[in-house]
């Protein structure tokens, strides 16, 4: 099981340092990526400091959105989010709420009611079905959508660094289970990234916060409430050693749930006032989603916000006011529910509220005044720290960790000790969960225990590995099963079977069972096979991703050649019509020939927007063959003829 885990025990020994130096050549610059439910962010450790990298739109955070336009173009990030209301069925977001989950997971079933795109069941998992243009339908695994977002972050970093990026540290919510972590790693592979570490978001935020606070031991509570997930972690920082003491949370609570409550309120209100049910109109719902999110943000700094939507539904406008008080009332139960994990984390770490030295707020939703107030009241009036940008903290910490892994000396002796978020154990007689590694155990770790057979002459034992806190395995989550065979005949209770659980630095669990009498061994690496993509599927998705990149490139080339022909034709049209330029110098016969040729090409363009590159090139050549002899005749040898391109060279069409 892939546990909450970060980079443990790095740069402690000179040997480790030398080894890191050796690795440095292979990995190049390692980037840190915060792959968020609603927004993602990328950073790099460079020249002794972290740079959060802005995307091609100049924004330091990028929407985790992917869209497919009717023309067959794929958009990622801001461009995808900006056209959500006009193309809701083919604009995919919230992939992180589906990744690593099964189709019948209650949260998946709840989510698909509200998602504008189609989610279908495939191999017991949720897949996303969209029209990718030209009437073609395609299904994508959530990993593939996340991979597209990761590709965008990778390209953002490459544009800034001016070189290829192949290795990354990617963050996940601390409460993500094994399947969700593995699926995130698979998304990295599909995007062409070697994910060197999966680290927990609150741990990353604590690194960002604690990097410059190296004196003495501090207890830090990280409260991370983002667009789709909620995490609380308690860490101690002691001279650059970060230890996660306890972690808790809800992988399905965030800003989008607050938006949803407000949307439901307005949909009901609209129905009450007009008798019309807006839910039937996907576009109207997405328009409302966009405006509600804007209003929510505005309410962090003002007490009321107006929501105005022109031609909202059946041509009618929508105009309502949302007050901060109403927003809080609609979400109060959700806001209050964030305090339970805080209480649990304190109990798990045997600390009192007064033992907390710093409270760090992370994630855009912590800008909500009511959330800040509840946290402050819970800690008896203690003010949370403000010196950290809640949107960028996680990527910042991931970038520091990436710096450590690429052997950057400026990171100092940074050590991260993380914990596993859930208890691990095996099933014993009667369906009992026998715990081997309790939750909040620092990893990496290794534990062994001796078991025996339940019946006489039993030749095989089945080892079933579970994660969870309940006393019976039926209430916990099965991670994997394997058999140890060839046990010699013996009365029950005589054979000695040693079961060992070992968690490595990435939180991957390996379980071994050994018959002490015969030395016969079997082992399993928990990779959640029933939930994971197979290597073949990953390979296919990598190829698909490359195909998409290739298609994006071809599409751009096609648009460029179309624009060249269009610019050439219109430039000629303008020059022929201008008496000061060509128009005044041509004979009426030549003018008519050129006008006819130009009009013909413009008409052809209008009816052949989707022609291929060769057609556009051929049509341009045809036009040149008619125009150039006329212009050459006109100018004789008085210098290069105006090809009509002089005004358009080096400029992209808008």
From Swiss-Prot:
InterPro entries: ATPase_NBD, BIP_NBD, Heat_shock_70_CS, HSP70_C_sf, HSP70_peptide-bd_sf, Hsp_70_fam. ATP binds at residues 36-39, 96, 227-229, 293-300, 364-367. Residues 420-500 are annotated as: Substrate-binding (SBD). Its EC number is 3.6.4.10. The modification Phosphoserine is found at residue 86. Residues 1-80 are annotated as: Required for interaction with ELAPOR1. It catalyses: ATP + H2O = ADP + phosphate + H(+). Antibodies against the protein protects endothelial cells from invasion by the fungus R.delemar, a causative agent of mucormycosis, and could thus potentially be used to treat mucormycosis disease. Antibodies against the protein also protect a diabetic ketoacidosis mouse model against mucormycosis. The modification 3'-nitrotyrosine is found at residue 160. The modification N6,N6-dimethyllysine is found at residue 585. Residues 125-280 are annotated as: Nucleotide-binding (NBD). The modification N6,N6,N6-trimethyllysine is found at residue 585. The modification Phosphothreonine is found at residues 518, 643, 648. Residues 644-654 have a biased composition (Acidic residues). There is a cross-link at residue 353 (Glycyl lysine isopeptide (Lys-Gly) (interchain with G-Cter in SUMO1)). The modification Omega-N-methylarginine is found at residue 492. AMPylated by FICD. In unstressed cells, AMPylation at Thr-518 by FICD inactivates the chaperome activity: AMPylated form is locked in a relatively inert state and only weakly stimulated by J domain-containing proteins. In response to endoplasmic reticulum stress, de-AMPylation by the same protein, FICD, restores the chaperone activity. The modification O-AMP-threonine is found at residue 518. Keywords: Acetylation, ATP-binding, Chaperone, Cytoplasm, Endoplasmic reticulum, Host-virus interaction, Hydrolase, Isopeptide bond, Methylation, Nitration, Nucleotide-binding, Phosphoprotein, Signal, Ubl conjugation. The keyword rRNA-binding does not apply. Residues 1-18 form the signal peptide. Belongs to the heat shock protein 70 family. Monomer and homooligomer; homooligomerization via the interdomain linker inactivates the chaperone activity and acts as a storage of HSPA5/BiP molecules. Interacts with DNAJC1 (via J domain). Component of an EIF2 complex at least composed of CELF1/CUGBP1, CALR, CALR3, EIF2S1, EIF2S2, HSP90B1 and HSPA5. Part of a large chaperone multiprotein complex comprising DNAJB11, HSP90B1, HSPA5, HYOU, PDIA2, PDIA4, PDIA6, PPIB, SDF2L1, UGGT1 and very small amounts of ERP29, but not, or at very low levels, CALR nor CANX. Interacts with TMEM132A and TRIM21. It is linked to Autoantigen in rheumatoid arthritis. This is Endoplasmic reticulum chaperone BiP. It comes from Homo sapiens. The gene is HSPA5.
């Amino acid at each position: 099981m892939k546990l909450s885990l970060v980079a443990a025990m790095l740069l402690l020994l000179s040997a480790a340092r030398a080894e890191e130096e050796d690795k440095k050549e292979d990995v190049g610059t390692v980037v840190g990526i915060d792959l968020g439910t609603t927004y993602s962010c990328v950073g790099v450790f460079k020249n002794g400091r972290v740079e959060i990298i802005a995307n091609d739109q100049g924004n330091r955070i990028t929407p985790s959105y992917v869209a497919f336009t009717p023309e067959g173009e794929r958009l990622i990030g801001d461009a995808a989010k900006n056209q959500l209301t006009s193309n809701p069925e083919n604009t995919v977001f919230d992939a992180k709420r589906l990744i690593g989950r099964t189709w019948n997971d209650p949260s998946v079933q709840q989510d698909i009611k509200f998602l504008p795109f189609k989610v279908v069941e495939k191999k017991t998992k949720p897949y996303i079905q969209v029209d990718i243009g030209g009437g073609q339908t395609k299904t994508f695994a959530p990993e593939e959508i996340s991979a597209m977002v990761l590709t965008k972050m990778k390209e953002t970093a490459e544009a800034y660094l001016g070189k290829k990026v192949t290795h990354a540290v990617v963050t996940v919510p601390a409460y993500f289970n094994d399947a969700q972590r593995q699926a995130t790693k698979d998304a990295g592979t599909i995007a062409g990234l070697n994910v060197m570490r999966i680290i927990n978001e609150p741990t990353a935020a604590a690194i960002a916060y604690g990097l410059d606070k190296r004196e003495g031991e501090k207890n830090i509570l990280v409260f991370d409430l983002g667009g789709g997930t909620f995490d609380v972690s308690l860490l101690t920082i002691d001279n650059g050693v970060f230890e996660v003491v306890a972690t808790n949370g809800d992988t399905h609570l965030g800003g989008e749930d607050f938006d949803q409550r407000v949307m439901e309120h307005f949909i009901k209100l609209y129905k009450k006032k007009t008798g019309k049910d807006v839910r039937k109109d996907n576009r109207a719902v997405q328009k409302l989603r966009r405006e509600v999110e804007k209003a929510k943000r505005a309410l962090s700094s003002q007490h009321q916000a107006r929501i105005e939507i022109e031609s909202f539904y059946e041509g009618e406008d929508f105009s309502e006011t949302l007050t901060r008080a109403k927003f809080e009332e609609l979400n109060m139960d959700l806001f209050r529910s964030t305090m339970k994990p805080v209480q649990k984390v304190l109990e798990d770490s045997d600390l009192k509220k007064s033992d907390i030295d710093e409270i760090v707020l992370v994630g855009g939703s912590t800008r909500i005044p009511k959330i800040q107030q509840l946290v402050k009241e819970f800690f008896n009036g203690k003010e949370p720290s403000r010196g950290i940008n809640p949107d960028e903290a996680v990527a910042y910490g991931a970038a520091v960790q990436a710096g450590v892994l690429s052997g950057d000396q400026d990171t100092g002796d940074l050590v991260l000790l993380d914990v596993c978020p859930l208890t691990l154990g095996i099933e014993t007689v009667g369906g009992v969960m026998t715990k081997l590694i309790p939750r909040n155990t620092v990893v990496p770790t290794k534990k062994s225990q001796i078991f025996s057979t339940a019946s006489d002459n039993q030749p095989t034992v089945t080892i079933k590995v579970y994660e969870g806190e309940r006393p019976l395995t039926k209430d916990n989550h099965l991670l994997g099963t394997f058999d140890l065979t060839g046990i010699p005949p013996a009365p029950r209770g005589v054979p000695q079977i040693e079961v060992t659980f070992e968690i490595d630095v990435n939180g991957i669990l390996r379980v071994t069972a050994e018959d002490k009498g015969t030395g016969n061994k079997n082992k399993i690496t928990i990779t959640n096979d029933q939930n994971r993509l197979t290597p073949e599927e990953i390979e296919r998705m990598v190829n698909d991703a490359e195909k998409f990149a290739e298609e994006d490139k071809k599409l751009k080339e096609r648009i460029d050649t179309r624009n060249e022909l269009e610019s050439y034709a219109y430039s000629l049209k303008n020059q022929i019509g201008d008496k000061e330029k060509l128009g005044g110098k041509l004979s009426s016969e030549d003018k008519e020939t050129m006008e006819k040729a130009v009009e013909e090409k413009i008409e052809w363009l209008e009816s052949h927007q989707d022609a291929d590159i060769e057609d556009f090139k051929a049509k341009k050549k045809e036009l040149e063959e008619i125009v150039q002899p006329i212009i050459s005749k006109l100018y004789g040898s008085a210098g290069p003829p105006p090809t009509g391109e002089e005004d358009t060279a080096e400029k992209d069409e808008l």
